[in-house]
């Protein structure tokens, strides 16, 4: 179940139920608020698309919070030619997987695999991990060329 004061795409409820029976808090903020949150929580002074904050296991508490940058949702959806709902679903999935303990920077592809599973099940566009890999590959090709 999702705890959110704003409206959000219905598909997020389906994704959440598919991945966990637990509750998750969802927040939408703008790029400036996200930059400040990223700076204060991670020491990185730039905006980002999604942050997730797992909570310690507390009875009757949400599993954690997912914070989505609504400005970047609009930008990425337009840039990648898909809907804002689809972009929001990708970011939500990515954040929820982090809350559930997945870590694409440390695992052996388990998070990428789970993200791909959700993408296929809910017919979503390319995942954040795959998009990041595409950018790194293009950068590598450009450096060699």
Swiss-Prot record:
It is an enzyme of class 3 (hydrolase). Single strand-specific metallo-endoribonuclease involved in late-stage 70S ribosome quality control and in maturation of the 3' terminus of the 16S rRNA. It comes from Campylobacter concisus (strain 13826). Keywords: Cytoplasm, Endonuclease, Hydrolase, Metal-binding, Nuclease, Ribosome biogenesis, rRNA processing, Zinc. Its cofactor is Zn(2+). It is found in: Cytoplasm. Zn(2+) binds at residues 94, 98, 104. It comes from the Bacteria. Belongs to the endoribonuclease YbeY family. One of its GO terms (cellular component) is cytoplasm. Its EC number is 3.1.-.-. This is Endoribonuclease YbeY.
């Amino acid at each position: 179940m999702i705890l959110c004061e704003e409206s959000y795409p219905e598909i997020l409820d389906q994704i959440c139920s598919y991945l966990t029976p637990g509750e998750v808090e969802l927040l939408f903020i703008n790029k400036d608020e996200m930059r400040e949150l990223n700076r204060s929580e991670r020491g990185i002074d730039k905006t980002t698309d999604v942050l997730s904050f797992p909570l310690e296991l507390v009875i009757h508490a949400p599993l954690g919070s997912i914070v989505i940058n609504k400005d970047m949702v609009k930008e990425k959806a337009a840039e990648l030619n898909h809907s804002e709902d689809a972009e929001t679903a990708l970011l939500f999935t990515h954040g929820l997987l982090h809350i559930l303990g997945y870590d694409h920077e440390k695992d052996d592809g388990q998070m990428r695999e789970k993200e791909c599973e959700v993408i296929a099940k809910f017919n979503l566009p390319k995942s954040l991990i795959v998009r990041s890999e595409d950018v790194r590959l293009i950068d590598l090709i450009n450096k060699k060329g």
